[in-house]
């Protein structure tokens, strides 16, 4: 991952928020939604949510603008074990402005690297974001 491909930097406050989120002790579903501040050329925090299901989360995402999401999900495995994977979701809806798409796509890898996440997914429509979709994606990481 070459730093020369970075389009936008990550806001230092967001870096700290991501660090705290990564080590949170709560056992509920939670999310951080991030956006690109075009004027500052920076990825910034847009909103935080506690006790939010995938279906509720998708209602918080714009249908025509990209967003980055870090989602802490209470995942109950088939054998009864419970884990709390941190998922990075890049919402990149069809029909976004090409300039926006490039800013987000060019900033994604750096943000994933800073957040230290390995479960990285992309959705092309907010309708894709639901519990079934998320469980299918997470099943790959067993």
Curated annotation (Swiss-Prot):
Superkingdom of origin: Eukaryota
Protein family according to the UniProt entry: Belongs to the actin-binding proteins ADF family. GMF subfamily.
Expressing tissues: Expressed in rat thymus, testis, and spleen. Is present predominantly in proliferative and differentiative organs.
Cited SUPFAM superfamilies: Actin depolymerizing proteins
PTM sites of type N-acetylserine: 2
Protein name as it appears in the record: Glia maturation factor gamma
Family matches, as InterPro entries: ADF-H (IPR002108), ADF-H/Gelsolin-like_dom_sf (IPR029006), GMF (IPR011171)
Gene3D superfamilies linked: Severin
Keyword entries, A-Z: Acetylation, Growth factor
Any single GO CC term annotated in Swiss-Prot or TrEMBL for this entry: cortical actin cytoskeleton
Record Pfam families: Cofilin_ADF
């Amino acid at each position: 991952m070459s730093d020369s491909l970075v389009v936008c930097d990550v806001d230092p406050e967001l870096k700290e928020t991501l660090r705290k989120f990564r080590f949170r002790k709560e056992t509920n579903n939670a999310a951080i939604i991030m956006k690109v501040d075009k004027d500052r050329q920076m990825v910034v925090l847009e909103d935080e949510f506690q006790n939010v299901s995938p279906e509720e989360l998708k209602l918080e995402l714009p249908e025509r603008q990209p967003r980055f999401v870090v989602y802490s999900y209470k995942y109950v495995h088939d054998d009864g074990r419970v884990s709390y994977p941190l998922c990075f979701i890049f919402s990149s809806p069809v029909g976004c402005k090409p300039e926006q798409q490039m800013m987000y796509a060019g900033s994604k890898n750096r943000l994933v690297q800073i957040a230290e996440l390995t479960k990285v997914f992309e959705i092309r429509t907010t309708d894709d974001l639901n519990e079934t979709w998320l469980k299918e994606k997470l099943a790959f990481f067993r």
